[in-house]
Amino acid sequence: MNLTRREFAKANAAAIAAAAAGLPILVRASNLVTEADVTSLVWNKAPCRFCGTGCSVMVATRDGQVVATHGDIKAEVNRGINCVKGYFLSKIMYGSDRLTRPLLRMKDGKFDKQGEFQPISWEQAFDIMAEKFKAALKAKGPESVGMFGSGQWTVWEGYAANKLFKAGLRSNNIDPNARHCMASAVMGFMRSFGMDEPMGCYDDIEATDSFVLWGSNMAEMHPVLWSRVTDRRLSAPQVKVAVLSTFEHRSFELADLPMVFKPQTDLIILNYIANHIIESGAVNRDFVERHVRFAHGAEDIGYGLRPDDPLEKKAKNADKANTWSDIDFKAFAEFVKPYTLERTARESGVPAERLKALAELYADPKRKVVSFWTMGFNQHTRGVWANNLIYNIHLLTGKISEPGNSPFSLTGQPSACGTAREVGTFSHRLPADLVVTNPKHRETAEKIWKVPAGTIQEKVGFHAVQQSRMLNDGVLNVYWTQVSNNMQAGPNVMQEVLPGWRNPDNFVIVSDVYPTVSAQAADLILPSAMWVEKEGAFGNAERRTQFWHQLVKAPGEAKSDLWQLVEFSKRFTTDEVWPAELLAKAPELKGKTLYDVLFRNGQVDRFPASDLAKGYANDEVDAFGFYIQKGLFEEYAAFGRGHGHDLAPFDAYHEARGLRWPVVDGKETRWRYREGYDPYVSKGSGVQFYGYPDKKAIVFALPYEPPAEAPDQDYPFWLATGRVLEHWHTGSMTARVPELYKAVPDALVYMHPEDARQLKLRRGSEVKVVSRRGEIRARVETRGRNKPPQGLVFVPFFDANKLINKVTLDATDPISKQTDYKKCAVRIELLNLA
């Protein structure tokens, strides 16, 4: 075979990705010849279906199926390469057990909670859903119904769900699975800056001198970005990489400063760095005086456990967790003074010389620094504090909001930013950083949505972990989940998740593509379309919004989540779900369906079907008779335009490889809050953190506080959970790709060889991982990619046959309500198979 240089480069990239998973090099063949006249393939762009990096891929279709993908060479994010998951995108939709018809638990021809799943029609599915919703609403009100959504929802799916629940059904009990991964990042941004989402962008990678990873294994979780970090590190001799984690992983291979610290002591390290910056005279005084104020956050705030838990009863400020008082720089300096190098080395276990070298990276005024973090910071009972403390360091030094200087929170899902955060599908949020507790914010949403004043409830709804508890307690009775698998991904499954789903008083609906663990525990399963089987939009970690067209049809009777939400809204009239006093404010809405009120309101339905680009299918346009995606997007965009969240016109995104908001006058923003880059910054001001009225960011004084649970005599090991390169989240897609499944078929218990020896275990021994809440069986791994220190084990959560979340603790950050999956106590027992 004769290859051009371009073909060779593409084949080589494919080979590298394949080799990472131990796959045959022949994978290159599917990514070589792409000319349509040779292959009869039709190629279109789409963002990758997996992580929050937002890689763009070229998708090939033929005879109504996706048959190949390759990296999009025109994309700024990934520049033509993909990780190993991205190279197998063409296979994720075609698992042999794809769901194609609604399935209801039935016995003797009718619904039975203990019955077997039997196929029914969509009409029957919506009939029983409407019956259950209406009965719960009539008996107990809006608090009795809820929804669990996703950072994998498209922008308009999340927006439609938000409208349906918060305005239509008047229930704020809607929360995304991003609560498990990004809620602490959200609250960190909101507290420090008054606005959500990163100020920097991926361009920082090529502009910086230093990378510091805090609880982020980018080599496996953001591998395409890691390739850019690696290129920068190997291309510029002055560049340094520091990696901090509770165990050694693949990102350590590039580290100049590798640091394994004891769980929870990242808080101590962060405060030490701030102290070092102050004591060494490295504070950027001019920046701090002009752009920063100081606050002391509430302490002893509890652990987000049930109110009757002894730890919650003991906490002094559990009900005031998100409060603070103003202090000055001098008081802040006194606060961090006890966090000395000696104390930090002793309590964290990191050698003093490495800690000092890390602090000097930040303190050196000649060095630019990018701090990256993911779940190690966010899945943390003090995750919001950890986010605030890293911002402290960048603010004290002025290393922020400019090329190469950036604190950068990386997201895990393809639209955790674009949908969960920006659309506001959390139980306390509305679009564009508005919140349900603020009367002016509710008024803004009600006006845009054209519903009566008072429609949106002011009480915050149940967050993700609370939803499980309320199902368990019988408070929440009808529950619909889409694009999520909480029976596998949620914490403390056996005590808090499963009992609520199987509670005979509750009715649970799961919309999904495959029969996941969650689907198998549900009462009604709805088959969903996925990825390019529908038109969609995602928003990635650098504020980049990306669109794609529908390229193929979904199999059987599978329907998009958008269609399901909008079609279901036809089953309710305002008389059935709104009180008389609310209808009295808008008598013209009396008797109308929620579909009429929310989706045929003169805004969502104002774009005709003829606006659809020629040559593309759109099943929702066919179903509803208008360009619903465009209408939903433009209505949603009204929340942010003119308020620092500006989005471009709908059609611009189909032409571009994504645009980073705010987009003003057709120009995207790469660095927020900095004059010359951000159109919202006043001329001559240099920097304005305009999320707060005084345009200043806040530096927080926050202490070290211990975790909710730590090893003891009965449970002597720390347990951390997480992911691996080859699988994504719960593996419901990647485990159905033969090559990825073959590469990593099972979750393993990674542990230190000396711990294994002391327990008379060896590599491959089958063990039980046991906590106070549950247990699983798995095999020991003492070699390979993950190298825990003594006293800690790591188990990934992708394996549906080894549900590690039977074991985890449902402690959460009291401010963000995000679960700490990185710290609980377990013991390891050898299985006696005799």
Swiss-Prot record:
It catalyses: 2 Fe(II)-[cytochrome] + nitrate + 2 H(+) = 2 Fe(III)-[cytochrome] + nitrite + H2O. Residues 1-29 form the signal peptide. One of its GO terms (molecular function) is electron transfer activity. It comes from the Bacteria. One of its GO terms (biological process) is nitrate assimilation. Keywords: 4Fe-4S, Electron transport, Iron, Iron-sulfur, Metal-binding, Molybdenum, Nitrate assimilation, Oxidoreductase, Periplasm, Signal, Transport. Binds 1 [4Fe-4S] cluster. Its cofactor is [4Fe-4S] cluster; Mo-bis(molybdopterin guanine dinucleotide). PROSITE patterns: 4FE4S_MOW_BIS_MGD, MOLYBDOPTERIN_PROK_1, TAT. Predicted to be exported by the Tat system. The position of the signal peptide cleavage has not been experimentally proven. [4Fe-4S] cluster binds at residues 48, 51, 55, 83. InterPro entries: Asp_de-COase-like_dom_sf (IPR009010), CT_Nitrate-R-NapA-like (IPR041957), MoPterin_dinucl-bd_dom (IPR006657), Mopterin_OxRdtase (IPR006656), Mopterin_OxRdtase_4Fe-4S_dom (IPR006963), MopterinOxRdtase_cofactor_BS (IPR027467), Periplasm_NO3_reductase_lsu (IPR010051), Prok_molybdopt-oxidoreductase (IPR050123). Substrate binds at residue 797. The keyword Iron-sulfur applies. Its EC number is 1.9.6.1. Disulfide bonds: none annotated. It is found in: Periplasm. One of its GO terms (cellular component) is periplasmic space. Mo-bis(molybdopterin guanine dinucleotide) binds at residues 85, 152, 177, 181, 214-221, 245-249, 264-266, 375, 379, 485, 511-512, 534, 561, 721-730, 805, 822. Its main location: periplasm. Catalytic subunit of the periplasmic nitrate reductase complex NapAB. Receives electrons from NapB and catalyzes the reduction of nitrate to nitrite. Belongs to the prokaryotic molybdopterin-containing oxidoreductase family. NasA/NapA/NarB subfamily. PANTHER family: PERIPLASMIC NITRATE REDUCTASE, RESPIRATORY NITRATE REDUCTASE. This is Periplasmic nitrate reductase. It comes from Pseudomonas aeruginosa (strain UCBPP-PA14).
